[in-house]
From Swiss-Prot:
Molecular-function GO terms, alphabetical: rRNA binding; structural constituent of ribosome
Keyword rRNA-binding on entry: yes
Lineage, opening ranks: Bacteria, Pseudomonadati, Pseudomonadota, Alphaproteobacteria, Hyphomicrobiales
Keyword Ribosomal protein attributed: yes
Cross-referenced Pfam families: Ribosomal_L3
Post-translational modification summary for this protein: Methylated by PrmB.
Quaternary context: Part of the 50S ribosomal subunit. Forms a cluster with proteins L14 and L19.
Organism: Rhizobium leguminosarum bv. trifolii (strain WSM2304)
Name this polypeptide is given: Large ribosomal subunit protein uL3
GO CC annotation terms, alphabetical: cytosolic large ribosomal subunit
């Protein structure tokens, strides 16, 4: 099990494959993705690498993190994430990971924070059909309707689909295909949509369920 990477979402575009078909892709940019710390079985009880990406001003970095970056002899990073790895995949502190870490055609799992939509109704949030337009329905056309029974069970069950805060949640999209990479510019082109807004930090790992596809 090897390390993933931290990348920044640039936006979406499309490219053409060898058959002349256009493929929608999300462009991710890797900006100075370096190993800033390691975790070992002897010292921590597990093996992992801690990566940092982007650039942060020293004044905006906490004193503890400044110390960590100084020990690793790297510039302060805007985003830090830890990846569990097998013992033979541990990397030296200061090692930079580039876009060539992934190959075209490979499947990856992508993690990001979805765009927040604020408080949303049941129709927008869960795709409910709403109530009828006429025949006695007044004001409640977009409501979710009944939420439970009567005295038995006498409550609304947990996880009932209702109106509420939509988006801004941590989401992992599995088995997305890497269309191509550009190591010189640090770009990874992934087929389809990736959770998060433009400029958001994204975690990209090797797919864990790729054998099933």
């Amino acid at each position: 099990m090897r390390s993933g990477v931290i990348a920044q979402k640039v936006g979406m575009t499309r490219v053409y494959n060898d058959a002349g078909e256009h493929v929608p892709v999300t462009v991710l940019r890797m900006d100075g993705c370096q190993v800033v710390a390691t975790r070992t079985v002897e010292k921590n009880g597990y093996t992992a690498v801690q990566l940092g990406a982007g650039q942060a001003k020293v004044k905006n970095t906490s004193k503890a993190m400044r110390g960590n970056f100084a020990v690793a002899n790297v510039e302060p990073k805007a985003k830090v994430a830890e990846f569990r790895v097998s013992e033979d995949q541990l990397l030296e502190i200061g090692t930079e990971i580039k876009a060539g870490h992934f190959a075209a055609g490979q499947l990856v799992d992508v993690t990001g924070t979805t765009i927040g939509k604020g408080f949303a109704g049941a129709m927008k949030r869960h795709g409910f059909g709403g109530l009828r337009a006429t025949h006695g329905v007044s004001v409640s056309h977009r409501s979710h309707g009944s939420t439970g029974s009567r005295q038995d069970p006498g409550k609304v069950f947990k996880n009932k689909k209702m109106a509420g805060h939509m988006g801004q949640t941590r989401v992992t999209t599995q088995n997305l295909e890497v269309v191509s990479t550009d190591e010189d510019r640090g770009l990874i082109l992934i087929k389809g949509a990736v959770p998060g807004s433009k400029g958001a930090w994204i975690i990209v790992r090797d797919a864990v369920k790729s054998a099933a596809k």
